[in-house]
């Protein structure tokens, strides 16, 4: 990768890391469900405008719309809700560390579902190291009562499973769809899925939204969804999907740094050591740095 692409990869990791900070801030003003709804709905409106203004031709079919529906659930609705509800009891920094297990879960699931994604020696080592990192973050002494006492952490770990299924589904069913079209379709379907629940159960909250919550939500949608997706498309076209794993390595440190600087939120020693172990696992999964030496 050239220096320009490295900057884009680092910037994407920073933007996605910022999503945990935005959730942390918005939880002070609105409900988790409303946070997710405003993020996907505002982002979808902006992306639809982009598609229209760019005069991108859409060849929609029932199958493609169905694929967008599934991707909306797996890549937006489920993980966004799980992370946002999880962050009610889990700090943004810790949430970003736990969410880094997405890559390990994707590798494991892909090896079971896809014929061309075998579990190589380096992948097995990377996944095992990643699992050790997650255990360190949770705390070995807390494992036995984890499901009962750490619901927020469980929700965030489950979000990684949803992202993993989404990555595999996209690889199989959306391979020939333009990334910007896929993102627009996915976010639009997410908005349509969530809208009935908003109208039925959150009508009072919609009416009570203030300028602060709307402003933060708009920033959240623009920075962490729209702008992030545009950079994602650029990386995908110019360097390939393989370099997106580097973003996964950058997200937790970015989230921790942003949360520490802006809201003074720090992680403990277990979480820090676990983070380093998880990053090591991701580097081994990526493989390129190991091959150099």
Segment roles from a protein language model:
Residues 49-55, 103-125, 253-272:
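C-terminal transmembrane-helix exit sites in multi-pass transporters
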Residues 15, 19-20, 48-99, 135-136, ...:
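Specific transmembrane alpha-helical segments of multi-pass solute transporters/efflux pumps
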Residues 47, 69, 109, 121-141, ...:
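Hydrophobic transmembrane alpha-helices of multi-pass small-molecule transport proteins
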Residues 1-34, 85, 145-172, 192, ...:
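Glycine-/small-residue-enriched transmembrane alpha-helix faces in small-molecule transporters
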Residues 26, 35, 39, 86, ...:
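Hydrophobic/aromatic residues within transmembrane alpha-helices
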Residues 1-5, 29-33, 37, 60-66, ...:
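Juxtamembrane helix-entry segments on the extracytoplasmic side of multipass membrane proteins
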Residues 106-108, 112, 144-202, 231:
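Transmembrane alpha-helical segments that form core, pore/gating elements
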Residues 38, 76, 95-101, 169-192, ...:
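Helix-helix packing/entry segments at the starts of transmembrane helices
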């Amino acid at each position: 990768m050239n220096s320009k692409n490295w900057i884009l990869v680092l910037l994407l990791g920073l933007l996605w890391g910022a999503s945990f900070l935005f959730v942390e801030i918005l939880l002070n003003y609105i409900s988790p469900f409303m946070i997710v709804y405003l993020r996907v709905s505002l982002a979808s409106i902006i992306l639809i405008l982009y598609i229209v203004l760019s005069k991108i031709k859409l060849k929609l079919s029932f199958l493609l719309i169905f694929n967008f529906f599934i991707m909306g659930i797996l890549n937006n609705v489920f993980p966004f809700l799980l992370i946002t509800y999880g962050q009610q009891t889990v700090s943004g920094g810790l949430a970003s560390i736990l969410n880094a297990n997405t890559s390990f879960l994707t590798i494991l699931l892909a090896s079971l579902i896809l014929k061309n994604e075998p579990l190589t020696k380096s992948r097995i080592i990377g996944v095992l190291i990643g699992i050790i990192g997650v255990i360190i973050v949770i705390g070995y002494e807390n494992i036995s009562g984890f499901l009962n006492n750490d619901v927020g952490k469980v929700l965030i770990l489950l979000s990684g499973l949803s992202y993993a299924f989404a990555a595999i589904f996209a690889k199989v069913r959306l391979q020939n769809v333009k990334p910007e079209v896929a993102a627009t379709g996915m976010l639009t379907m997410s908005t349509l899925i969530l809208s009935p629940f908003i109208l039925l159960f959150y009508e009072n909250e919609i009416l009570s939204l203030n300028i602060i919550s709307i402003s933060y939500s708009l920033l959240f949608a623009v920075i962490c969804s729209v702008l992030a997706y545009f950079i994602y498309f650029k990386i995908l076209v110019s360097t390939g999907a393989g370099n997106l794993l580097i973003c996964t390595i950058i997200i937790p440190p970015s989230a921790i740094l942003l949360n520490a600087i802006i809201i003074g939120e720090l992680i403990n020693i277990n979480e820090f050591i676990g983070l380093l172990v998880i990053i090591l696992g991701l580097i081994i999964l990526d493989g390129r740095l190991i091959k150099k030496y």
